UniProtKB/Swiss-Prot annotation:
It comes from Yarrowia lipolytica (strain CLIB 122 / E 150) (Yeast). The keyword Protein transport applies. Coiled coil: none annotated. This is Autophagy-related protein 3. Disulfide bonds: none annotated. The gene is ATG3.
Amino acid sequence: MEAHKGKQDIFIVQVLITPTFVELNHIYPPIRLLSPPSISSNPSIKFDKTQAPPTLFIYIASYNTPDYQTTLHKSTMLHVRAAASSLREYLTPVSNTSTFRTTGEITPDEFVKAGDYLVEKFPTWSWASASKSKVRDFLPPDKQVLVTRHVPSHVRASTVSGPVTLGEEEDGWTSFGVANTKDADGDDTEEIAEIADSDFEELDDDDDDAAEAPATATDHRTYNLYIAYSTSYRVPKMFLSGYSPEGSPLTPEDMFEDIIPEYRDKTVTIERPTFQDNITMVAIHPCKHANVMRVLMERVEAKGDKDITRGVAKLGVADADDGEGEEEWEEVENSAMRVDQYLVTFLKFIASVTPGIEHDYTMSAL
């Protein structure tokens, strides 16, 4: 702070943590809360537990701001959002009440059932334990997170025929995926329905085009993908850890290139995972997952569609029973999707966000 000259104003940035998204608002005009000498003796973050929903107030110093506005760097915003997400995860109690059918949310027990099903049917996925300090007591010690490793990526998301849309309408997945100021139960729900209505045919066409595009050695990347359980949103949460052709960890900025632009800009965070120490990963924020899953399940029931994975080529799984090399996936035995089949549909959903990651690899890649 000694490096700065001139007048100092303190701004409050309000981080409103809701069940739907994290909203960042600047409060104007600035409020002179603390004099410079007293800043170091006061906490920089306050949390008011009496608020519902919880609200964080973060003090940010701003110098020489005659227009009484301050602009936070994009990376700062990402870290603020990640910090808010981590705090919300820590503070939210675990729910064991099943609302799978009505909300699209699942309990920890249902997450384990869905993970067992995924591992049994698609053996490129496996359960893993967590770092000692990160063990979550509401999950079995050896089933803290699901992981699949060495998933190749040869093209960046922006080169897969531009923004990925999943329906025939103008508004597709990309506009839905942004956590903005829309009413969470209004326009977004209609857009989710468009996604669920589609058979992901356009996504498959894009994948075929991408496969024909020449890729150089420098384009090749590999990913370890992790599915953890989010207590704050009561849904699975996807973490990505990428590596260069030389095996060096990718920076968050590099990994952003493999997530569709409209999604990465608003609902992707850089954070320490809930299951591992001393590492930073990119996480796909789960604020919309429950709504997507609920609508997808409703569409499965309405159509009586027995094949919940029809038309999806890139899910990071290899079926142990698939001997013909075709994209034949587990069928739903009844018109209603079972809770243990939840993660298969979840991965169908995630595949649209990371179209450049080639999940259709074989066991020989391990």
